[in-house]
């Protein structure tokens, strides 16, 4: 600042006489110890001037009635600097602030805080442009990370909050609702492999009801918990197979019905994506098995109803009749004996419809070794 120039100008006015008591160039000391030199009016800073504060801070710019007002530059002893508009000793209007960490803000201010539209260039290469309130990202804005990720949408207290769209560096993207920086509420996430989830979220994980579209044509619609299919849902395969029932941790688990495209149906218990527990299986040809299952095969006790009218009731192992069992034919004839790997194996008794024994004998690997008619 050229104090001499100010002095000459003021002296010229003083010669004129009218402003003798109004304008001057001089020195003023504030109550906080700050020292001012520059234009004065009624013995207070007014116009252009410079103030040096006891802690080393310095302001150079315009004053009005003893307060910073108009254009000015504030340099702090910690290395931060503000260049812009002031009103009643506060940053207000448009201005640029340089932070010690090399962040730079350009935009609107109100009562010493970033308020309105502005742009922040962060030291790490990130950028934000949008609305601010109380020196935080609040309202609509766009944040671009140095790595290439982009979020455009609503903010609250520096966090993604409200409706917005995020695109990650790998190309995956989410569009929907946010809360406290998390995906929360309803939204759609598209994966890089083409998969897509549309539904409810809770603190960044799929939680609630949703639909997941797989890039291979599979589809799941139902309940989620902690990003896993958990609860009731329907899983559809591109070949026409359908499972409807309970899920746990992403797998068919609980009670459910699986319908194959070829017409076969299973209804019963599942565990870890397999038929486990009590269940009923209907083949496409009409045969029916009802009983215990283990690892997708009939295992334990059960009944096998054949389309020819015969019924087997007894033990199963690895999907075949194994152990003690009874076959009841359509005409009422009953075979009681041992089975092994789906074949008659061991001693047997055969009865007629009235329960009378009509034959006994022995089978080996499905072959009759001997018999005795009664």
Regions found by a protein language model. Give the residues of each.
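N-terminal signal peptide c-region/cleavage motif recognized by signal peptidases
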Residues: 16-18
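Conserved anchor residues at repeat-unit boundaries in beta-strand-based tandem repeats, strongest
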Residues: 35-45, 58-69, 81-92, 104-115, ...
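Short beta-strand elements of solenoid repeat domains
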Residues: 50-53, 60, 73-76, 83, ...
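N-terminal segments that cap or nucleate solenoid repeat domains
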Residues: 21-58, 371-374
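Repetitive helical segments and hydrophobic/amphipathic motifs
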Residues: 11-14
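Bacterial N-terminal signal peptides that target proteins for export
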Residues: 1-8
């Amino acid at each position: 600042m050229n104090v001499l120039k100010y002095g000459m100008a003021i002296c010229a006015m003083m010669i004129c006489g009218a402003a003798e008591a109004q304008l001057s160039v001089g020195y003023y000391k504030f109550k906080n110890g700050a020292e001012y030199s520059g234009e004065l009016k009624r013995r207070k800073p007014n116009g252009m001037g410079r103030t040096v504060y006891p802690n080393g801070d310095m302001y150079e710019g315009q004053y009005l009635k003893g307060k910073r007002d108009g254009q000015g530059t504030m340099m702090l002893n910690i290395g931060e600097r503000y260049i812009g508009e002031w009103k009643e000793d506060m940053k207000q209007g448009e201005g640029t602030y340089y932070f010690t960490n090399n962040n730079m803000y350009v935009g609107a201010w109100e009562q010493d805080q970033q308020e309105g539209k502005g742009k922040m260039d962060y030291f790490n290469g990130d950028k934000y442009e949008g609305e601010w309130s109380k020196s935080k990202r609040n309202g609509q804005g766009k944040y671009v990370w140095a790595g290439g990720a982009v979020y455009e949408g609503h903010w609250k207290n520096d966090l993604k909050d409200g409706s917005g769209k995020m695109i990650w560096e790998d190309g995956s993207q989410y569009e929907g609702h946010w809360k406290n920086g998390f995906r929360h509420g309803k939204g759609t996430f598209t994966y890089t492999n083409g998969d897509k989830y549309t539904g409810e979220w809770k603190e960044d994980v799929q939680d609630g009801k949703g639909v997941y579209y797989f890039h291979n044509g599979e589809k799941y619609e139902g309940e989620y918990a902690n990003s896993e299919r958990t609860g009731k849902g329907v899983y559809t395969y591109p070949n026409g197979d359908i499972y409807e029932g309970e899920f746990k941790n992403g797998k068919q688990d609980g009670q459910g019905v699986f319908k194959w495209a070829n017409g076969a149906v299973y209804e019963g218990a599942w565990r870890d994506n397999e038929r486990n527990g009590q269940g009923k299986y209907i083949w496409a040809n009409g045969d029916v098995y009802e009983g215990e299952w283990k690892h997708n095969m009939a295992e334990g006790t059960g009944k096998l109803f054949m389309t020819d009218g015969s019924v087997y009731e007894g033990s199963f192992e690895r999907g075949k009749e194994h152990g003690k069992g009874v076959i009841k034919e359509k005409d009422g004839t009953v075979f009681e004996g041992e089975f092994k790997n789906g074949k008659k194996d061991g001693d047997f008794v055969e009865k007629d419809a009235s329960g009378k024994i009509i034959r006994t004998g022995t089978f080996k690997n499905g072959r009759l070794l001997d018999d005795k008619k009664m």
